[in-house]
Amino acid sequence: MIPDVSQALSWLEAHPHALKGIRRGIERETLRVTEDGKLATTGHPEKLGAALTHHWITTDFAEALLEFITPVDDNLDHLLTFLRDIHRHVARNLGEERMWPLSMPCFIEAEQDIELAQFGSSNIGRMKTLYREGLKNRYGALMQTISGVHYNFSLPLEFWQAWAGVKDAESGKEQISAGYFRLIRNYYRFGWVIPYLFGASPAICSSFLKGRETALPFERTEQGMCYLPYATSLRLSDLGYTNKSQSNLGITFNDLQSYVEGLKRAIVTPSEEFAKLGVKDGDRHLQLNSNVLQIENELYAPIRPKRVTKSGETPSDALLRGGIEYIEVRSLDINPFSPIGVDAVQARFLDLFLIWCVLADAPEMSSDELLCTRKNWNRVILEGRKPGQTIGIGCDDSREPLAKVGKALFDDLRRVAEVLDSEAGDRQYQQVCDELVAAFDDPELTFSARILKAMKEEGTGRVGLQLAEQYRQMLIEEPLEILTETELAKEQEASWQRQRNVEASDTLSFEEFLKQHGGS
């Protein structure tokens, strides 16, 4: 049902120090909206600095889609407070605009209302916008305004020294990477637990479906909200951002070499479908190229192996150079019950689950098995709270009750929690287990059930507006705790200077620059 990790857990209990110094980072996306919930049509606020070069505040797909990025931190409470400080600062500098507190956008009337993120006149800035133009033409702009939270996680070197016998990160990069790939394979097999507990997009505004075909059996409320009664995360469904042509790429997560080869293959494999869009219309670029992926970042995945890139380096070249440095978890919806879109319970759960994913045995996976793990995810995404819901075990037809598998997993997570708590001298991780395991016996405790109840009563739009206003007031009134106004002003000015420097250092024409960077 789940891998037997009793030996690994016994090892962990004998090596509690191996988990000291886990490092994390959080990225949170949120749409800027007007006081009546419509997508903001203003440019990225100047007071928030230059989106191209600011260390903590940038934009994602759209000019109105803010993204907040924390520095790497080995203290969870400090990390979340830093993220809250960014939110406090932004709330004070948005005028009458608010941050939309849900993953799914609502009051967007027409796709042409969505302006692509702008990054200045430098070649790299223009290329970033052109990449987004390609995404818009390939998948539609509305899909790209869906927001989420990314959780970046790495285990300390001490863990790998004790667990895999490595000496240092440089000589041990193969073993460390193998350990993270094991984590990723287990995440594909069991990560559906994340949308089960924390999925918070069971409903959408009807405007989101306008002109789109869907086979999903939506129910509708009088206000025009569309929902699936047992859904957890429509953001992660095919309604959200998935690339059908990617499922045939055959990218696997068994070792560094084959993963990178698969990724590099995808960025040079022509796509008939995308070629039909054209690459240029006269002088106007429509996409970077017509390959299956314009660049590596276009690969849709619920989890990614990562390494910080050096200047001019692609993500896959960075991985080949130094191995996997950390992993990025991409399956979290915005938490509507938190003013910052994520909370400590979720972060602690992810710590526990990701540690378990490293410890648990994970046989290699073919691309076929990878596709078959998607069935469990889809079942949880679309009807995870259905009474008596079952989960497929492996790729044959055997199934077990979801609640039984979930509770078995939590039996293991509790032992990991005891190790982390014994080091910290408290019970915080065990309390997370107590709180979350109850949701397997009572699905009404899940985020999706709680938010759907409110949405059925008030409508998606009104729930979003009420929370946005409540959080705006709260964040504006709260004092900063870690950052200071002086530091924020300094970073704002420094970011503009960095952007000017980038623009001044360009030597190539945009066309030449594109040719050098995979454009066509």
From Swiss-Prot:
Looking up Pfam families in the UniProt record yields: Glu_cys_ligase (PF04262)
Q: What is its EC number?
A: 6.3.2.2
GO function terms (MF aspect): ATP binding; glutamate-cysteine ligase activity; metal ion binding
Which InterPro entries does UniProt cross-reference here?
Answer: Gln_synth/guanido_kin_cat_dom, Glu_cys_ligase, Glut_cys_ligase
Q: In which pathway does it act?
A: Sulfur metabolism; glutathione biosynthesis; glutathione from L-cysteine and L-glutamate: step 1/2
Question: Is Cytoplasm included in the keywords of this UniProt record?
Answer: no
What keywords tag this UniProt record?
Answer: ATP-binding, Glutathione biosynthesis, Ligase, Nucleotide-binding
One Gene Ontology term of the biological-process aspect is: glutathione biosynthetic process
The entry's cellular-component GO terms read: cytosol
Q: Its catalytic activity?
A: L-cysteine + L-glutamate + ATP = gamma-L-glutamyl-L-cysteine + ADP + phosphate + H(+)
Per the record, the similarity remark reads: Belongs to the glutamate--cysteine ligase type 1 family. Type 1 subfamily.
UniProt-listed HAMAP family? Glu_cys_ligase
Q: What is this protein called?
A: Glutamate--cysteine ligase
